[in-house]
Amino acid sequence: MRFAAPLLLIVAAAPLAGCGAAHDPALNEQQAAAAQNRAPDRDKVMADRWSGIFTNPAAVVAAANDFGFKAEGYRASGKGYAATGKVTWPEKPNGIAVESVFEATGPAADRIETVRFTFDVKHDAKPGERARDSYGYVRRIVLGFLSRFEVGPGDTINGALQRRESAKDVQHGVSIVVDANPISGGNAKDRHITVTFTRVGASAPANQTQGK
């Protein structure tokens, strides 16, 4: 009988421990749903995934480098932190060249507030037969980057990327802006396209391009 009291304490404490785990703020929505034995809230799951872009600089740099940007890392720069990289597609000229710059900026080593891709899409006077295959580079890079975090840009932004037009939208706490303009003095089809992802509520300095 002398073991009865401790046994009762253990049994009584078990439900409390379970409740504590279910409400642990360190858990994401999928983990919390599993702990509470319920279906996850899709909006919260997507918000968690988008948040991962801004709370994991190493993963962001790795995702950009998957597409050849060769960013060296998220490092102290000016009044904050930044990672940058450049790449040109395709490797062999075929009537079109896509010069691209990747930038991630933020106020701290563990936090990003803005991710930006800039594309200069330039055409020869008479693009080759393979040039049409290169028109989709901008969209493929942006969607490919986002897919690393299991998110997508939504129909509005996806359509703008397909048409190389300007647009803006907000997805799960993230502002997405596509700014597409002709390149002065270039071919009529040439475009300067900037795709910017900003955490809603980001501070002004993090929204500015480093070094400008």
Model feature map: region roles:
Residues 47-68, 137-156:
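Short, non-transmembrane alpha-helical segments in secretory-pathway proteins
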Residues 100-162:
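Long, charged/polar, surface-exposed segments that mediate recognition or autoinhibition
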Residues 65-108, 147-185:
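A cross-family detector of function-defining hotspots
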Residues 190-212:
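Short, low-complexity, Pro/Ser/Thr/Gly-rich segments in the mature regions of secreted, periplasmic
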Residues 19-22:
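Bacterial signal peptide processing site
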Residues 27-52:
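Post-signal peptide N-terminal segment of mature Sec-exported envelope proteins
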